[in-house]
Regions:
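Nucleotide-activated chemistry modules centered on ATP-dependent adenylation/adenylyltransferase
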Residues: 1-217
Length: 217
């Protein structure tokens, strides 16, 4: 059973920020199925944005990226690879928040950092809606993810309105789709896809501060 109805789909093109293949698998499958049911080509209607500079080393980053690239190919969906810059992430997100707990202020700013990059890309490339697989993980605060996504899209809207006024046009705005991607049977389907695809399933979120047993964070 699909966890998404065709009428729930956004009208314009959708950009899905992917944090990893395990969290994205059921979302991509549900979106692709809903688009097909609506008579729309998922390869034309959506793309995946890979922006995860929180990951603490390049080898880990590339390993996770390879999995989402492999999976997206099955659906004919493009993956946009954002620049990897962990040093910038450390400076902008982690500095002064190194000792913050998981689900604390560092996590909120991490989501904001990554989703701001996704929102800017969406605005610049004609995507009208942004969502993220971060909202599928039970280890993440849905409230933080939603706040970061709304902030990112509101900031892009303010920038494009200002630029549009200067240029005499309205500019491109991006809507935030703050869906709970755990519902509609997607959580158990997520776990099934991990096994079916034999995904590399990491044991920590990505940054050096998130390493260690989750129960200790």
């Amino acid at each position: 059973m699909n966890g998404l109805l065709p009428e729930e789909l956004p009208e314009g093109r959708l950009l899905l920020h992917s944090c990893c293949a395990p969290c994205s698998g059921a979302i991509v499958e549900a979106l692709a199925e809903a688009y097909r049911q609506a008579g729309r080509d998922p390869g034309e209607e959506m793309a995946i944005f890979w922006s995860n500079s929180n990951i603490c080393d390049r080898e880990e980053y590339d390993k996770r990226k390879a999995e989402i690239l492999r999976y997206a190919r099955e659906f004919g969906i493009e993956v946009i690879d954002d620049d990897y810059d962990h040093e910038e992430w450390l400076a902008q997100v982690a500095k002064g928040r190194e000792d913050a707990p998981e689900r604390g202020p560092r996590c909120l700013e991490c989501f904001a950092f990554r989703l701001a990059r996704a929102a800017r890309y969406a605005a610049e490339h004609g995507f009208g809606t942004l969502t993220t697989s971060l909202a599928s993980s039970r280890w993440k605060s849905l409230e933080q993810v939603d706040e970061a996504g709304r902030r990112a899209c509101e900031a892009v809207g303010a920038d494009t309105r200002a630029a549009g006024q200067a240029a005499g046009s309205t500019g491109q705005t991006v809507q935030w789709w703050g869906r709970n991607w755990r519902k509609g049977g997607l959580q158990p389907r997520r776990n099934e896809i991990i096994r079916e695809q034999n995904f590399y399933n990491q044991t920590f979120c990505g940054c050096e501060f998130s390493k260690g047993p989750i129960s200790q964070n």
